[in-house]
Regions:
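N-terminal hydrophobic membrane-entry segments
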Residues: 1-192
Length: 192
């Protein structure tokens, strides 16, 4: 144990992951925990939020004011997402948030849910028209997130469900409510 510490090792959980191979570990000195590799499926990228590492310098630029992006190995949201594949990732040192890069559909329909379940809390938009009718408007929106912009999305919103529920839902509802106020029910149906 002293030789390990003198050679630069540290007490506690080690950040370095042992990948496949044969290792001779002194069980009186250390224990090894087996953790499955992190899998990023095709059609997704993985945005890494690291809890360890050096304090990084912001790579997001002066125009982006919602947080900082850092390079791989530094503490914070990494500026480059993990592409599809298997990764030996220390789940105690950070987390990987999956972000879909294929088109997905959000449905503003109460009992219908898309394949990713991002829209499970969405329902039809309640409108009030110029002539005082109160129709509900079911909507479907196709969303695409560029894989290079995925770290920016996670840095700003935390995850895709929060993006949908806290930003897209209020924006879409407000837009259609504003449009409906200026039109009669017949105009709204004709121009839809």
């Amino acid at each position: 144990a002293d030789r390990f510490l003198n050679a630069g090792g540290m007490r506690g959980r080690q950040l370095q992951v042992l990948v496949e191979g044969t290792y001779y570990v002194n069980r009186l000195f250390a224990t090894v925990e087996m953790i499955e590799k992190t899998v990023i499926d095709v059609g997704n990228v993985g945005v890494v939020v690291s809890y360890t590492g050096e304090q990084g310098t912001d790579l997001s630029g002066s125009e982006y004011r919602h947080g900082e992006l850092v390079t791989r190995g530094q503490r914070g949201v990494w500026s480059e997402a993990l592409l599809p594949g298997k990764y030996p990732f220390n789940t105690y040192a950070g987390k990987v948030i999956p972000v879909p890069t294929t088109n997905f559909i959000l449905k503003w329909i109460k009992n219908e849910v898309g394949s990713h379940n991002f829209d499970e809390n969405l329902s039809e938009v309640a409108l009030i028209t110029k002539d005082a009718f109160e129709p509900t408007l079911p909507l479907s929106v196709v969303v695409h997130i560029d894989y290079k912009k995925a770290p920016l999305v996670i840095q700003r919103f935390g995850d895709i469900k929060k993006l949908v529920e806290q930003t897209l839902d209020p924006m879409v509802a407000a837009y259609f409510k504003n449009v409906a106020q200026t039109r009669t029910l017949i105009q709204l149906l004709q121009e839809r």
